[in-house]
Structures are given as C-alpha cells and as structure tokens.
A protein has these predicted regions:
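Local sequence-structure signature of Cys/Sec-based thiol-disulfide redox active-site neighborhoods
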Residues: 2-30
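Short helix-capping segments at alpha-helix termini
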Residues: 32-36
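A short, hydrophobic beta-strand/beta-hairpin element that forms part of a small beta-sheet core
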Residues: 58-67
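Thiol-based oxidoreductase modules, predominantly thioredoxin-like and allied folds used
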Residues: 37-48
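Surface-exposed interaction regions that form or flank ligand-binding interfaces
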Residues: 54
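Thiol-/selenol-based redox modules, centered on thioredoxin-like
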Residues: 78-86
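N-terminal, polar/charged subdomain of small-to-medium soluble alpha/beta proteins
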Residues: 67, 72-74
C-alpha cells in the first residue's frame, strides 16, 4: 500500500499466524477513520535481529522509535500519540 503524504507511520512488529497481531492491526485500522496515519507491518521472523529483539513481545506498535504498546492495543496510548502529532 502506498504511503499517504504527510501521514505519520506506526510500525507493527508482528509474525505470521499471530491472532493477537491480527487483532491489534484491525484495531489500528479502526483509528484510521479519526486520524491520518499509515501502518507498516514488519514480520520479526524475517530478520534474526528483530526476532531476538522482539521475541515473544509481538505484536509491538512503535512510532518514531518509541514503543506505544505490545501484546494488546492500548488505544489511549496510541490516540494520545496521534493527537500530539496532528
């Protein structure tokens, strides 16, 4: 998917067959109706360094190098971040 000009980027560190990852990505997509941001999904199993770093923490949402949440969607934290960058 093409990036939206001027949109913030939320990176989701994920892995295949991770229902928590799927749930978190779906929750982020619902916020795209209120905020302009792109979602980049990175498979941690595609890179040994990422797998070592994130291991069992997935899913992890990061923005500008800062972790916003892991395991489950923290809508308050993500919304607070997105409101500061409007």
């Amino acid at each position: 998917m093409a990036r939206v000009a001027g949109a913030r980027l939320l990176t989701v560190y994920s892995r295949t067959y991770c229902h928590l990852c799927d749930d978190l990505i779906a929750a982020l997509r619902t916020l795209q109706g209120r905020f302009v941001f792109d979602i980049e999904v990175v498979d941690v199993d595609s890179d040994a360094a990422l797998e070592a770093r994130y291991g069992e923490l997935v899913p992890v949402v990061e923005a500008e190098g800062r972790e916003l949440c892991h395991y489950f969607m923290d809508e308050a934290a993500v919304t607070a971040y997105l409101m500061t960058v409007r």
